[in-house]
């Protein structure tokens, strides 16, 4: 006896569903549990480790696959992999209230850990503990966004915490060595991007050791490469400039 199975139905088990409404229709993708947040945070980069199948569904639990014409109309493409990426990034993860609560608590902790790792008290150059950052986040009533990466949210938290406490991103320590003919002109262009100059030696070449905001690194690197046509050098001496010692602000 044969059992008829419709070709547009796929049965899946132990699945995490991510849903998106677009063009008046509901679309879903089937993912492995615990992998959706890893993808969104950037920890997991292999799509095949996240998706149980590259198919796009109208309803995962019923195994109903979306029609190609609906995909084209709503997403402007029939490429299931590209559509899966869109839904994975912007869709809503369907979880129980208990699972959602646990997930958000973990993200809250992860965000606080990133902030504590990247920041210091600007007056003392001492780092803050994760617990203190968590308390500060609660004081400003920070609400975790499940669809946004923890790294991006950490940057948002730093901006908000600056309004209520002494905090800033720890500076990077750099050394540039610039050809003499480019040195003076390039130094003027670099000035606005430098927080503090520790030393400056001008002999046959211009050598500067300085502190910068990590957010300026890419611009500085590009400026030196372009202006010196690859003859200048840029060396990262330390990723975080903090005071020596184990003391942390509680």
From Swiss-Prot:
ATP-binding in keyword set: no
Keyword Acetylation: yes
Single GO term (MF): ribosome binding
Domain of life: Eukaryota
A GO CC term assigned to this protein in UniProt: cytoplasm
Principal subcellular localisation of the protein: cytoplasm
Annotated positions of the N-acetylserine modification: 2
Locations listed in the record: Cytoplasm; Nucleus, Nucleolus; Nucleus, Nucleoplasm; Cytoplasm, Cytoskeleton, Spindle
Gene Ontology BP, a term: hematopoietic progenitor cell differentiation
Pfam families membership: SBDS_C, SBDS_domain_II, SBDS_N
Signal peptide as annotated in the record: none
TM spans (from-to): none
Alphabetical keyword list: Acetylation, Cytoplasm, Cytoskeleton, Nucleus, Ribosome biogenesis
Family named by the database record: Belongs to the SDO1/SBDS family.
Main function: Required for the assembly of mature ribosomes and ribosome biogenesis. Together with EFL1, triggers the GTP-dependent release of eif6 from 60S pre-ribosomes in the cytoplasm, thereby activating ribosomes for translation competence by allowing 80S ribosome assembly and facilitating eif6 recycling to the nucleus, where it is required for 60S rRNA processing and nuclear export. Required for normal levels of protein synthesis. May play a role in cellular stress resistance. May play a role in cellular response to DNA damage. May play a role in cell proliferation.
NCBIfam families tied to this protein: RNA_SBDS
The protein's assembly and partners: Associates with the 60S ribosomal subunit.
Name of protein: Ribosome maturation protein SBDS
Taxonomic lineage of the native organism: Eukaryota, Metazoa, Chordata, Craniata, Vertebrata
């Amino acid at each position: 006896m044969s059992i008829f199975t419709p070709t547009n139905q796929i049965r899946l088990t132990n699945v995490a569903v991510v849903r998106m409404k677009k063009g008046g229709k509901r679309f879903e993708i089937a993912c492995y549990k615990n992998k959706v947040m890893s993808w969104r945070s950037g920890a997991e980069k292999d799509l095949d480790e996240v998706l149980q199948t590259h198919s796009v569904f109208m309803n995962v639990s019923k195994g109903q696959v979306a029609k190609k014409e609906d995909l084209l109309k709503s997403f402007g493409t029939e490429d299931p992999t590209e559509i899966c990426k869109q839904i994975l990034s912007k869709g809503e993860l369907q979880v129980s209230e208990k699972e959602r609560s646990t997930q958000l608590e973990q993200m809250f902790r992860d965000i606080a850990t990133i902030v504590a790792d990247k920041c210091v008290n600007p007056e003392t150059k001492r780092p803050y503990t994760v617990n203190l950052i968590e308390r500060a986040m609660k004081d400003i009533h920070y609400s975790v966004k499940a669809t946004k990466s923890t790294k991006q949210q950490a940057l948002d938290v730093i901006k908000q915490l600056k309004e209520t406490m002494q905090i800033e991103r720890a500076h990077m320590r750099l050394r540039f060595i610039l050809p003499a003919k480019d040195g003076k002109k390039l130094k003027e262009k670099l000035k606005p991007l430098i927080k503090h100059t520790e030393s400056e030696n001008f002999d046959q070449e211009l050598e500067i050791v300085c502190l910068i905001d990590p957010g300026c690194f890419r611009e500085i690197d590009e400026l030196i490469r372009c202006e010196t046509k690859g003859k200048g050098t840029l060396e990262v001496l330390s990723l975080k400039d903090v005071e020596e010692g184990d003391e942390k602000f509680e």
